[in-house]
């Protein structure tokens, strides 16, 4: 039906007769001439109808936005004064000789000239996806997956599919369950990741595996989370953690070079402890120049319990955050930031305004100045590198609250005061995570998942001191987003059972949930390691949006619903009966 795409016409096509198919993006009726911007997935081209082709001109008078049409015409160069430098096709236009209206469009529920609500965009997603910026994002996503497949093929990885209907295993979030009609009362689980299957593939001898795969997690959603999402899933045998990182870093550098024309360079490597200490986050945004600086040793003797308490507590921390140019902040802004850190458990926000650095105590303005000596102020200013016009904010509490509160404040100030370099790419690897963390109920939970191997520990050493264990794990972070994470896996049955025991999984439960894995570990399991990237998150970064729904064709809302199809929906009673399911309604509160 077409010979060319609208958006691909150039001066090289001048004089050629072309047939185009697409939609009316805009129409301008000048009486004797009608101009339309005609759009397809590749872009927009100007088409015009003149009186010499009366039939086509007459039919063109009926055109409205989003009519689906076919046009045949001749490509012409525009006069110099009419060249549109803002359009890829702005040097040419098409003189139409014939027009076919394939399908008309009713009045549109989306307004092309105004910002539509996200609710409307999701309900009429098929119209929203016609917008050039949305089409471009999905084209970029397709390019990314194509680049990934070629790269992985070139590096000897095999694309192997793993099951969608599988067994529920604890991986940190709730499973989506699928009832079995054949096995009444039993349920499959949709995979949160192909974790165990890809490990089993390593045990099967396929030493380099990858898959671009759908995963499902029934969890509370955020702007960068979806109940169903896509992973670039990777596993290798006989490779160390640094070797895995080297290959995966090369993949991501390849993507940025091909999609953005940017060489990311070598990725720095930072330990979890250093990231938390300097940035208050295990996914630091290195575009932001501000860092947390420990000052507890300077404040142990002050007569100000807010500082002295945490400064003398082994589990406490006092840290300072220097904000370049922050002395300009108003009292209201400071109060607003004080309320902001309370969201993260902080009780408030002490500060020092640095007016004249050289004057020390006399050159600052601070509500806590009366508790500080000149020597202490000089030491704080020296350690933080403060300059005239800077602000220093303090966090004083337990270590987690200080990291969370000042880490979040650092990001907010970086954005609010334009301190974060939005034109920069800042990738890094974060390694050496704690293997376990407190579950809040006196037990331990795996920081990543229960199949991650510890670094340099035997099973007996791990059992004796699990809280000291460091995971042989690694996360890739770009501009403050965790885009991928992985680890070296446990390949020894004793170690795996030890980890299960630390997590409170007894032997009977181990057999019920992981018997197949424990059996497989008995038969010459190779050392293996892997990683998974979030394709949606990578695409989000590469297309410059901050909403993951913008890079998924048909996403869910933050309530895990599809507004277009109205999923989820109620099942009919006959289907439920056949599955042996009875729906129990919650009693209404009186």
UniProtKB/Swiss-Prot annotation:
Its EC number is 6.1.1.12. ATP binds at residues 217-219, 226, 482, 534-537. Keywords: Aminoacyl-tRNA synthetase, ATP-binding, Cytoplasm, Ligase, Nucleotide-binding, Protein biosynthesis. It is an enzyme of class 6 (ligase). Its main location: cytoplasm. GO terms for biological process: aspartyl-tRNA aminoacylation. It is found in: Cytoplasm. GO terms for cellular component: cytoplasm. Residues 195-198 are annotated as: Aspartate. L-aspartate binds at residues 171, 217, 448, 489. It catalyses: tRNA(Asp) + L-aspartate + ATP = L-aspartyl-tRNA(Asp) + AMP + diphosphate. GO terms for molecular function: aspartate-tRNA ligase activity; ATP binding; nucleic acid binding. Belongs to the class-II aminoacyl-tRNA synthetase family. Type 1 subfamily. HAMAP family: Asp_tRNA_synth_type1 (MF_00044). Catalyzes the attachment of L-aspartate to tRNA(Asp) in a two-step reaction: L-aspartate is first activated by ATP to form Asp-AMP and then transferred to the acceptor end of tRNA(Asp). Homodimer. This is Aspartate--tRNA ligase. The gene is aspS.
